[in-house]
Design a protein with these regions (language model features):
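Acidic/His- and Gly-rich active-site-bordering loop/insert found
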Residues: 1-98, 103, 107-123
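Hydrophobic face of alpha-helices
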Residues: 11-14, 35-39, 109, 207, ...
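Divalent metal-coordination and catalytic microenvironments
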Residues: 21, 59, 72, 102, ...
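Metal-dependent amide/peptide-bond hydrolase catalytic core
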Residues: 44, 211-390
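Conserved hydrophobic/aromatic beta-strand scaffold that supports enzyme active sites
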Residues: 56-60, 187, 345
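Non-cysteine beta-strand/loop elements that form the S-adenosyl-L-methionine
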Residues: 73, 82, 186, 343-350
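Histidine/acidic-residue-rich, glycine-tolerant segments that coordinate divalent metal ions
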Residues: 79-81, 85-97, 104, 109, ...
C-alpha cells in the first residue's frame, strides 16, 4: 500500500478530527480544549507526548532504526471573528472561527501521526510532531522553542492551506528561498494643539500632520529601496479627533513593515523615525515612534525543499498539482524555526473562492489525503536521506 493510499484510509479519522476542532475554535494561548483533544487522540494511538505551557503539545514517533530527528509542525489556534456559513460543523462559539485553516493543519498532522505510527519499521530515526499554539499573534513558535521543541531536530517541515487563489483545489506550491517576509509593527503618536475647526490657525492640527506622515512613509518603499526588492509599509489604523468641528491635538497610528532582507529590516526603525519626526516638525507638531520586531522572514532551505518536492511528486495523485512558486507578503511564525534548523514550508490550495481570514472561509476536505501523505513521505524520505548520507 502506498503512503497516499494509507492517507486515504485515515481520511474519515482526519475529517472527524477537523470537524470536532472546527466546532470549538480557541484563540492563541487559550487552546486548552483543542490541546486536550489532540492529547486524547495521541493517547488512543499510544504515541508519547508532553504538553506545552500554557497550550500545545509535542509528540514523538521513534522508528525501529536509530537516526536523526525530523519535525513536522501544525498550528492549532483560531481567529476572533464570526463564522458565516451553513456547515453542519460550523463554530459553536459566537465571535470565534477557524478562519485560517489551522483546524485542518492539526487534523492532517494527527492523520500523519496515525499513518507513521504503523510504519515504524520504515522510520530511520524519530519524527517529532509539533502542535504549536498561537500562530496568529506570532508568539507560538517561540513558546515551542523556549520549551525545547527544536532541541535535537535536524530539519522541520510545515504546510498551510490557502483559499481564494482561483487555482485548482489541491494544488501544492513549493518554493526555494524567500516565501514570507519579516513582519514588524510600529506605533506613532503625534502631538499638536487642539482648537476650534473654524480657527485652525489658533492650534496645531495633528490630523493634517498624521495624514502627511502616512503619505511620506510610502517613500521608504518607493524611493529608498530598490524596486526589485519587495517591501511593504502599511499604516493600518489612524485615530484622531473627537468631533467634526475640532482640530485634533492628538493622533495615533499603527502599521506594519515587511521585507525579505535582513539588512533592510535593521534600518527600518531609523528610517521611520527620521520621516515621522521631520514631518511632524514641518507641521509644527512633535511625534514619537515605537517599533516592535515580529516574525522574521521565512526562507525555505533549498536542500530540504528539494526533498519535500520529490516527496510531493511521489504522493500527489496528479503531477499537475505540484507547482513551483507561491508565497506572499503575509507573515508566518514558522519562520522562527528556520533560525534553528533548515526548514521548508509548502502551501496547499483548499478552495477557489473564499480567502483565509474571511467569515465565509471553507476548506475542501478532499485535500486532506495529500496533506497527510506529504507530511509522512517527507519525514520518511528526509530521515532515509540522512541515514544514507551521514
Amino acid at each position: 500500500m502506498t503512503i497516499y493510499e494509507k492517507a486515504l484510509e485515515v481520511q474519515p479519522f482526519v475529517q472527524d478530527c477537523r470537524r470536532t476542532i472546527h466546532r470549538w475554535p480557541e484563540l492563541g494561548m487559550e487552546e486548552f480544549r483543542t490541546t486536550d483533544f489532540i492529547c486524547e487522540k495521541l493517547d488512543e494511538m499510544g504515541i508519547p507526548y508532553r504538553r506545552l505551557e500554557p497550550t500545545g503539545c509535542i509528540a514523538e514517533i521513534k522508528g525501529n532504526q536509530s537516526g536523526k530527528i525530523v519535525a513536522l509542525r501544525a498550528d492549532i489556534d483560531a481567529l476572533q471573528m464570526n463564522e458565516i456559513n451553513d456547515l453542519p460543523f460550523r463554530s459553536e462559539r459566537p465571535g470565534y472561527m477557524h478562519g485560517c485553516g489551522h483546524d485542518t493543519h492539526t487534523a492532517m498532522l494527527l492523520g500523519a501521526a496515525k499513518v507513521l505510527n504503523t510504519m515504524r519499521e520504515e522510520i530511520n530515526g524519530t519524527v517529532r510532531l509539533i502542535f504549536q499554539p498561537s500562530e496568529e499573534n506570532g508568539l507560538g513558535s517561540q513558546v515551542v522553542a523556549d520549551q525545547g521543541g527544536m532541541e535535537g531536530v535536524s530539519a522541520c517541515f510545515g504546510e498551510h492551506v490557502f483559499g481564494g487563489t482561483g487555482e485548482k483545489v489541491g494544488v501544492v506550491h513549493y518554493k526555494k528561498g524567500g516565501l514570507f517576509p519579516s513582519a514588524d509593527t510600529f506605533w506613532i503618536h503625534v502631538h499638536g494643539i487642539g482648537c476650534h475647526g473654524a480657527m485652525p490657525d489658533m492650534g496645531v492640527d495633528a490630523t493634517v500632520c498624521a495624514a502627511a506622515i502616512v503619505m511620506n512613509l510610502q517613500s521608504i518603499a518607493s524611493r529608498e529601496i530598490s524596486p526589485l526588492e519587495p517591501v511593504v509599509v502599511t499604516v493600518g489604523s489612524l485615530h484622531s479627533g473627537t468631533a467634526y468641528n475640532i482640530c485634533s491635538g492628538e493622533a495615533e497610528m499603527t502599521g506594519t513593515v515587511r521585507t525579505f532582507s535582513k539588512e533592510h529590516r535593521k534600518t527600518f526603525p531609523d528610517r521611520l523615525r527620521r520621516i515621522v519626526e521631520n514631518t511632524a516638525r514641518a507641521y509644527r507638531c512633535t511625534a514619537e515612534v515605537e517599533y516592535g520586531c515580529g516574525s522574521s522572514a521565512l526562507i525555505n532551505d533549498p536542500y530540504v525543499t528539494e526533498i519535500a518536492r520529490k516527496a510531493a511528486e511521489k504522493i500527489l495523485p496528479d503531477s499537475s498539482l505540484l507547482v513551483e512558486g507561491g508565497g506572499s507578503m503575509g507573515a508566518e511564525d514558522f519562520s522562527l524555526y528556520t533560525e534553528y534548523v533548515p526548514c521548508t514550508f509548502f502551501t496547499i490550495g483548499c478552495g477557489e473562492e473564499t480567502f483565509n481570514h474571511n467569515e465565509h472561509f471553507v476548506v475542501d476536505e478532499s485535500i486532506f489525503p495529500s496533506g497527510v501523505a506529504l507530511h509522512v513521505q517527507f519525514a520518511i524520505d528526509y530521515l532515509n536521506d540522512q541515514a544514507t548520507n551521514t
